[in-house]
Regions:
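A short alpha-helix-loop-beta-strand transition element characteristic
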Residues: 84-90, 120-122
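The −1 position to Zn-ligating cysteines in a subset of zinc-ribbon hairpins
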Residues: 79, 95, 102, 112, ...
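Short metal-coordination and nucleic-acid-contact micro-motifs, chiefly zinc-binding Cys/His arrays
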Residues: 90-92, 109-110
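Cys/His-rich microdomains that often coordinate metals
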Residues: 103, 119-120
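Hydrophobic alpha-helical membrane-insertion segments
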Residues: 26-28, 107, 205, 209
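N-terminal Rossmann-like or analogous alpha/beta NTP/dinucleotide-binding catalytic cores
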Residues: 1-87, 100
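Structured secondary-structure scaffolds
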Residues: 1-16, 63, 68-72, 98, ...
């Protein structure tokens, strides 16, 4: 897609990178008798070699362990917290380590992850939560006003059904995981990997440091998920 757009003389910023934090990485490193950073360094080298062999010409390759990313994630977390959208609560439920996903009892069959069919772990811990429920109405309005925002149609319908159902606040920190970005105001917590990792799309564009570049390329014209 980036090659096609460049061939049409359009200004393209193609971003890729690696998601390097979380319990899955921590456990994989332990199994290899390596520190987490040693483990991810080896994996990143393989990815970069692969992209080169495939002639994939990205404009930036961001690692979520880089200082530019970690620093900006902390800043964004603080901004959300100052806006009153983060609070400390307690999570009790099921967690899939390979998928790094939380599940409730009703979503499980024989206590297997709905995504990968592996066994899930029972978790009970203090977490920071994001007030997603506060934005249910605005999310629904956005998707109804922009019918082509998500494609294909089947995925759009799936998401709309989830938004129309009761929307729960989501856990955005872990108190039992050391390998991650620390919550700025509470170093006993690390920021949940799916919050940390997904923010790379804007941290790589210089959010809060290089706003000229950020405003030039964000929001993204195309965001491929999968």
């Amino acid at each position: 897609l980036a090659r096609y757009k460049r061939a049409k003389n359009l200004d393209v910023f193609f971003l890729t990178g690696t998601d390097e934090h979380g319990q899955k990485i921590q456990k994989a490193a332990q199994a290899c008798d390596k520190s987490p950073i040693e483990f991810v360094n080896g994996v990143v080298d393989k990815f970069k070699t692969l992209w080169n062999d495939l002639n994939i010409s990205h404009d930036d390759f961001i690692r979520t362990t880089e200082d530019r990313h970690c620093r900006r994630v902390k800043k964004i977390f603080q901004q959300i917290q100052e806006n009153g959208d983060i609070y400390l609560g307690e999570y009790e439920g099921w967690y899939c380590v390979p998928c790094e996903s939380f599940w409730i009892e009703s979503q499980l069959k024989e206590r297997k992850c709905p995504e990968c069919n592996r066994s899930v772990e029972k978790v009970k811990e203090k977490n920071y939560f994001f007030r997603l429920s506060k934005y249910q109405k605005s999310l629904l309005e956005h998707h109804e006003k922009h019918p082509h925002f998500i494609q294909p149609e089947s995925r759009r319908n799936e998401l709309l059904q989830r938004i129309k159902s009761p929307v729960e606040d989501i856990s955005i920190s872990r108190s039992a995981i050391e390998w991650g970005i620390q919550v700025p105001s509470d170093h006993t917590h690390t920021i949940y990997v799916w919050i940390d990792a997904l923010l790379n799309y804007i941290t790589a564009l210089g959010y809060d440091d290089d706003m000229q570049k950020f405003q030039k390329y964000w929001p993204a014209s195309v965001h491929i998920i999968g």
